[in-house]
């Protein structure tokens, strides 16, 4: 199994395909295996690297750094694999590390996709207030109701079960996640001059599309994609649309043939 040593911990990754590199960073309810739709679709034309964050999937977190180590871990993976410049696709929790790394090392990121996330972004007071109020309304939902939209839950009970089964392999969950999130502002992200695509699921109850769109408008040079009939996990709920539109955007931004 492919591991990279990072201090006392080991970071697991899966790498398939040949071509321009795409790094996938999962959310708190996922791990490398959650990206199976993207791995199979994109490996025919790209090198796809799905990374387990420390404490998730097959990665350990001996130092118990949690989020505090995510950005350095990403740099460690890129260095170990000799990846000078990559496209990053990050969902939910993964977006925090991706955004912070992009601001810190913009020369290493050719395109950034922030899917179903505002994690790690300093929000204006009005948006922050609405997000805080929203969090109270979602407290009573089941985990599946939080991460998958009603369209998918009703139509795909087997795939919905698979989502939770994949998450069961994580040592860490949303309640036990340690560390401090490194935040950056939408202004700083825009000033990095890295192309950014914000992806929103139309049924996302955690990061509603209106709020994601509002933050996208504050991020200079960024683009916005909304995916219908998808909740907080658009990459999992509507993979065909996600794979096509996100890949086409990355290919355009990075001038892949």
Model-derived features: where do they sit?
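Catalytic active-site module of serine/aspartate enzymes centered on a nucleophile-bearing elbow/loop
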Residues: 222-257
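Conserved alpha/beta-hydrolase catalytic His-Asp/Glu region
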Residues: 122-125, 139-191
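Conserved alpha/beta-hydrolase "acid-adjacent" motif
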Residues: 205-211
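Alpha/beta-hydrolase fold catalytic core
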Residues: 1-22, 44-46, 83, 164-168, ...
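Active-site loop/oxyanion-hole signature of alpha/beta-hydrolase fold enzymes
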Residues: 37-40, 49-89, 93, 244
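Short beta-strand/loop motif that positions the catalytic acidic residue
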Residues: 192, 198-200, 204
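Conserved HGGG/HGGXW glycine-rich cap/lid loop of the alpha/beta-hydrolase fold
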Residues: 7-60
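Flexible "cap/lid" loop of the alpha/beta hydrolase fold
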Residues: 96-104, 109-138
